[in-house]
Every structure is written in structure tokens, then in C-alpha cells.
Amino acid sequence: MTARLSAISVYPVKSAAGIGVDRWPLDDFGLQFDRRWAVIDSTGVVLTQREYAGMSLVRTAIGDTGLRLEAPGMPQLQLPLADSGGSRLPVRIWSDSCEAARCAPEADEWWSALLGEWCHLVRMPDEALRKPGPDRVSFADAFSFLVLSEASLDALNSRLERPVPMNRFRPNLVVSGVAPHAEDEWAGIRIGSVELAITKACARCVMTTIDQATAARAVEPLRTLATYRRGPDGGVLFGQNARHLTRGTLSVGDAVVPEPRG
């Protein structure tokens, strides 16, 4: 069976819902517009579902008119895709920092009303040089891509009383036609003209326990994953982080050619 790219997801706002797309271009940061926006508190710290599970209920869409955000009980928010020239604010994400452009005041008000505390929506400028590793990244934790196979999720769901959907793990690229956890053995993959280097396994956190449709928290699937996916340092590993070596356009259905480790 040929390995193929079975799904592409873009997450414009960090920790908000993603967008499933059939075809999407890459830029210097990774998938175009992926995690180019983030919500920060009054001290500049990036907010995520880890603290605010309700961020999962924010639906995103990208079109000719810009970025659209919707959430239960909230008016629709429309924002331009381009940098609007807002003032720069310092942003802290994990152990590194950068500057980002403040979005419109109405965006701050929208998010503050949703989360119940004063916060700002910021956009990473095109010229930003956030480099938690060897490459520029947007507001992703550390790497531009998360790669996961359908078979890995199937293997997990076979152990769960209640199966979970793929969106619990928020991958960018989903691969079909491979064995469970085959991605653990890859040094890289080629998808059409795009080459990606597999960098390290993704250590999973409590965000996997948040139902992305309801924002309800539970103990699964992290509890079950911990019984068979512990890494050497104790982390619970599921999926692989990756960075792109070349640019191009990815399409669902593209053949995925793995490069084995070693």
C-alpha cells in the first residue's frame, strides 16, 4: 500500500480550532498562516487550551475577506490576513520570546470577553525571527509541523473504551497507508516537491484530554497512552515533529515517501 497524505490541517490561531484543507502552500514558517496569531495575557505570556479549554470552541476560517473567528455566544470577528501595522508587543512562549503585532482593539475585546480576562490578540510579523531551534517558526511550540499516521490513532483507539478523533492531537499532516507508529522510524519524508525532516517525537500534554467540540476535560486518551508510549525521559510520545527543508504546495492524496532512520 502506498503511503499518502490523507489530511492537512492549518491552525491560524494558536489553540483555536483548525481548518481542514485539501491543498495548501508553504511559506518560511511552515503551512501558510499556521499559528501566525496567538492570544497573550497582560504580561505577554501566550495563552493555550492548557489553561483555557474554551479556546477549542473558537472556529476559524480563512477566505478572500481575511481571517474569521466564531465562538458560541460571541459575534463573528473578521480580521485582515496581512500585518495591519499594529504596535509591537513582547511575547513569551515557553522559554523564548519575540515581538508580535497587536491586532485591532475589537479583537482584544472579543478574546477578553470570551476568556474572562484582559488579553490581546497578536500576529507574528512576516519579518519575525523567532527561532527556538534551527529554524524560524510561528507561534508553534517549537516546530513547524506535527505528523501523525491514521494507523497510530487506530492503535490507540483499539485500547480505549471510547475512541477519540484525530483532532485531539492537532496534527498538521496525517498519513495513511503505513503501520502504527511507522512515523517513529522516519528520518524524513518527501511529499511531492516538499521535503521534511523529522526532528523529534511529540511529547503529549493535557490538551489531548480536551474534547475539541465541547471543551470538556477528561483523563483519556493521555492515561492510556502513558501505558505504552512512554519515552526514555518519561514523556508520553505520540506523533513526530518536523521541519520543512523545501517549500511548495501540499495536496491531500499526495504520495508520501519516507526516508528511514539510519
Where do the model's predicted regions map?
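Metal-cofactor-dependent catalytic cores
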Residues: 1-262
